């Protein structure tokens, strides 16, 4: 079973003002977490300004980590909401240069101070374009997919047509939901990476924000993760507010 772990880069304005020294301290905290995770996780995935809250870019954070340990496998999320096509070309070159494993291209959440949502780049169009231009030979390009799929609608079909290396699910609620996704996607020769949020009181607010109901696996998260790992190509664990729990579970899964 391939288990990856998701980390959020530090916030740029954690207290509504910028402090360079605080930012450096928070970067050091991420470094410490990565050092621990390397013992138990196949790779690290850095998010890109989750919930529209400005953070150090995933690519910058990956480069910082790579500078002190280039052997660590890292993947990154990239939001298209904040970028035009020119900046996407600039962005895709950097992870290739830094030897990053893959990119998850996604629209991203709307920032609180967003002035508009016109002419947004669709992630599927970006992946389709970059794949047609042979970027896929240098880096894996992934797309996100809902945690529940009953059939292949137009939105899912467009993502399939983009031919990503893998689909990364939104946080999975049940094994049956994951089985449905895999049954629908596997015929297209696209891998499925199951994202799972660890159930914890400290993570409850994060779960509520994305409408996640972890009732099915709350009491037996390790068994649930193992079952998901048996049918998905990879598992991506996330525990945004409870890192100690994450390390405990990763040790048991090792």
Language-model features and meaning:
Residues 1-28, 74-86, 139-152, 208-219:
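Active-site mouth loops of central-metabolism enzymes
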Residues 7-11, 48-52, 80-82, 107-111, ...:
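Active-site-proximal loop/turn and secondary-structure-junction residues that shape catalytic pockets
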Residues 3-9, 42-46, 74-78, 103-105, ...:
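Hydrophobic faces of well-ordered beta-strands that scaffold small-molecule active sites
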Residues 28-47, 159-168, 230:
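Catalytic domains of carbohydrate-active enzymes, especially glycoside hydrolases
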Residues 51-75, 212-216:
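Flavin-dependent oxidoreductase catalytic cores
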Residues 52-65, 83-90, 109-132, 150-152, ...:
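Active-site-adjacent beta->alpha loops and helix N-cap segments on the catalytic face
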Residues 1-3, 225-253:
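C-terminal extensions of enzymes
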Residues 189-234:
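Catalytic-face loop-and-helix region of soluble metabolic enzyme cores
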């Amino acid at each position: 079973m391939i288990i990856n772990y998701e980390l959020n880069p530090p916030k740029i304005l954690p207290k509504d003002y910028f402090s360079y020294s605080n930012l450096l301290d928070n970067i050091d905290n991420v470094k410490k977490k990565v050092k621990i995770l390397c013992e138990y996780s196949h790779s690290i995935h850095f998010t890109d300004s989750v919930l529209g809250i400005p953070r150090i870019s995933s690519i910058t954070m990956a480069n910082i980590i790579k500078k002190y340990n280039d052997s660590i496998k890292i993947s990154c999320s990239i939001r298209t909401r904040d970028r035009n096509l020119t900046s996407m070309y600039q962005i895709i070159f950097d992870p290739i240069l830094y030897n990053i494993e893959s990119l998850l291209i996604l629209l991203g959440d709307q920032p609180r101070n967003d002035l508009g949502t016109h002419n947004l780049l669709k992630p599927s169009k970006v992946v389709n374009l970059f794949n047609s231009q042979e970027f896929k030979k240098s880096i894996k390009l992934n797309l996100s997919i809902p945690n529940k799929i009953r059939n292949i609608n137009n939105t899912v079909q467009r993502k399939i047509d983009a031919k990503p290396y893998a689909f990364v699910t939104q946080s999975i609620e049940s094994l049956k939901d994951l089985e449905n996704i895999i049954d629908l996607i596997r015929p297209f020769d696209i891998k499925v990476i199951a994202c799972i949020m660890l159930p914890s009181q400290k993570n409850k607010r994060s779960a509520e924000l994305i409408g996640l109901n972890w009732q099915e696996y709350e009491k037996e998260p390790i068994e649930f993760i193992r079952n998901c790992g048996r049918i998905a190509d990879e598992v991506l664990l996330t525990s945004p507010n409870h890192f100690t729990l994450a390390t405990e579970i990763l040790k048991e899964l090792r």
